[in-house]
Amino acid sequence: MAGAGQTMPDGRPTPTGLEVPRWISLKSSHVRARQGPGLDYPILWEYRAAGLPVQVIAETTEWRKVCDPEGAVAWIHRTVSSGRRSVFNNTDAEIPIHAGKSQTSPVRARLQPRSIVSLDECEDGWCRVRARRLEGWVVQRAVFGAQSRA
């Protein structure tokens, strides 16, 4: 698959054929972050937030080197990640979720600090997000995980 045309930041082809950097999310609330790409490397910490968006900054066939909302970098196994997109409010302030793509559009809800919601799409500086039955728009730059590239 490496011949799919995608490359890592240093120009090498990616093992998966997917773009690097790219956004993924954590599948479970127990994801071990390791110092290197393999079970022989020490566990640095454990992520406890299913759906947390992280950015893949390098990869091997089985492992993904990711950067999290705090800027920490570690390796996770491919099986604990998902291609589903999500965003995270990594600020101490609530982020308004609007009915439409406008600051003047009615506020449907507020994304609480340290909260995760599903990401549907981003356009014109706005991202459509979902949480349970709620759907709305947030300013793209206000959330972690919505940027198109590093």
Regions found by a protein language model. Give the residues of each.
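SH3-family beta-barrel domains
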Residues: A2-Q35, E46-A50, I57-T60, C67-K101, ...
